A protein has these predicted regions:
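ASCE RecA-like P-loop NTPase motor cores
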Residues: 1-518
């Protein structure tokens, strides 16, 4: 399928038809930047969905936090149920980056926990983009500007099979291993495959079902999609593309070349430290990099291998890393949601990363090449963003300047809702006052959002409300990404009456059942 099919029970009303027509015309005429200035509740997401359906281009929707990205993903999934709507955010449930604090001589080791489900969704996004189909929407956080593998290496490891075509089983198994699938005949998990005679079962890294390939001699006899629990055949295929199990692909030749280049740069950097009269840093760097190279030779990877990504990608010093934007075709659209927040966030990513890494390089923990494992600079992102629609109720000067006066306004709400009444109340007895307001909402079967200043305050207030028989939960950055989505869904369904959070509840969340924000 290569055409977007918009599915909705509603028709554009209010300011939406005019906004859709203007934005569509702008994109089709090649206008580089436009701004959709829409008040809260005016249906900006529905407008953008209509524009995407009209222009029929692969589209990146960029959001400033994971929670809002998850909500947008859910909305676009409902608008385009028959198209490829993907989700691409950071796959870390917990991430402590490597750092060095010279003032206290403290080295902080990198520590992380990867969410397997989000890793699957990220792989699904890149696989859809490289499949060549046009009807792809990827909803992403700022993760899309962070470094990842070379798309050419990823694409070169795609395995194409056809029913009835000659393909040696042993060659096929070797290709699977090259694509980073792991053989496991006992416990078949995502990214594994098992072999039983002429039957090969592959648990695709980016899907929920197994792919079963049955060989007859050196020919592919059948290709089936199988339910991993029941074993029932769901679908049969004449041809199939198997995408790699990891976003970071390389070859043995590239690995050997990278090791050689790393050792050359190590020698130069050690020499520099010694000439500067810093033998301790020289010794530290020599030991750390030598150990990493031994690990890569023996196991194919090491802790912190991303700091050597420039060598594996074959990039020059200072050049930008590959990122999700490289997986899109030349002609694609970027929609930046809540742009007044998202644009400054994109701008800040490079500086924050550089400030941390500069100490690691300066004190001999990493080679200078570690500086090239980074997010895009804002200028690099702007250069790659050939066509952008900024979406905001309060666009900043940057968006307005970039749009050169092309501002599409959407101020009439299709629902006829008025702006909410804002009251400022004294902090004296604020909890008692809050409890009274919550009870009023509960009696009307409505929901309440409560914002606090800190994560600890959110947790303590939630505990207090629960002790007072209020169905309540909290979300903040320590709550897993997918768990946040479930909690917000539970709020809408009435499992909770109150949701407590910090500033991530501030922009863009669409919760029609909520009638009070305190």
């Amino acid at each position: 399928m290569n055409k977007f099919e918009l599915t909705s029970a509603y028709k554009p009303t209010g300011d939406q038809p005019e906004a859709i027509a203007e934005l569509t015309e702008g994109v089709l005429q090649g206008v580089p930047a436009q701004t959709l200035l829409g008040v809260t509740g005016s249906g900006k997401t529905f407008t953008i969905a209509n524009v995407i359906a009209n222009i029929n281009k692969p589209t990146l929707i960029l959001s400033h936090n994971k929670t809002l990205a998850a909500q947008l993903y859910s909305e676009f999934k409902s608008f385009f149920p028959n198209n490829a709507v993907e989700y691409y955010v950071s796959y870390y449930d917990y991430y402590q980056p490597e750092a060095y604090l010279p003032s206290s001589d403290t080295y902080i080791e990198k520590d992380l926990a990867i969410n397997d489900e989000i890793d699957k969704l990220r792989l699904a996004a890149t696989s859809s983009l490289l499949s060549g189909r046009k009807d792809v929407v990827v909803v992403s956080s700022v993760s899309c500007i962070y470094g990842m593998g070379n798309p050419s290496d990823f694409y070169n490891n795609v395995i194409e099979i056809q029913q009835g075509k000659a393909f040696s089983r042993n060659v096929f198994l070797r290709r699977l291993v090259d694509s980073l699938y792991v053989r496991n005949d006992i416990d078949l998990n995502r990214g594994n495959f098992r072999v039983k005679g002429d039957t090969v079962d592959i648990y695709l890294a980016y899907a929920d079902n197994l792919l079963r390939i049955i060989f007859w001699g050196d020919d592919v006899d059948s290709i089936e999609e199988v339910d991993p629990i029941s074993g029932v055949t769901i679908a049969r295929f004449d041809a199939y593309k198997i995408y790699p199990a990891n976003l970071f692909m390389t070859t043995k030749e590239a690995t050997l070349r990278a090791i050689h280049e790393i050792e050359d740069d190590l020698h130069k950097q050690v020499q520099w430290f010694e000439n500067e009269g810093r033998p301790f840093e020289a010794k530290r760097l020599q030991e750390r990099v030598t150990y990493d190279m031994e690990m890569i030779r023996e196991l194919g990877h090491c802790s912190g291998i991303e700091n050597y990504s420039r060598y594996f990608d074959g990039r020059k010093a200072g050049s930008r890393p590959y990122c999700l934007l490289d997986f899109f075709p030349e002609d694609f659209l970027i929609v930046i949601d809540e742009s007044h927040v998202s644009v400054p966030q994109i701008r800040a990513m490079y500086g924050g990363d550089r400030a941390r890494k500069i100490n690691l390089v300066e004190y001999g923990f990493r080679l200078p090449a570690a500086m090239d494992n980074r997010p895009l600079k804002f200028e690099e992102f702007a250069e790659m963003a050939k066509q952008v629609i900024y979406v905001s109720a309060t666009p900043a000067d940057y968006e307005l300047i970039q749009s050169e006066g092309i501002v599409v306004e959407q101020v009439i709400r299709p629902t006829g809702l008025l702006d909410p009444i804002i009251e400022v109340r004294p902090s004296h007895n604020q909890i008692d006052d809050l409890m009274e307001e919550i009870q009023i909402r509960i009696e009307k079967n409505e929901r309440t959002l409560v914002t606090t200043l800190t994560k600890r305050m959110a947790e303590e207030l939630t505990e207090f409300l629960l002790n007072n028989n209020v169905k309540c939960n909290y979300i903040h950055s320590d709550v897993d990404t997918l768990e946040r989505v479930k909690i917000m869904s539970d709020l809408r369904e009435g499992i909770y009456d109150v949701l407590v959070g910090v500033n991530l509840l501030r922009e863009g969340l669409d919760l029609p059942e909520v009638s009070l924000v305190a």
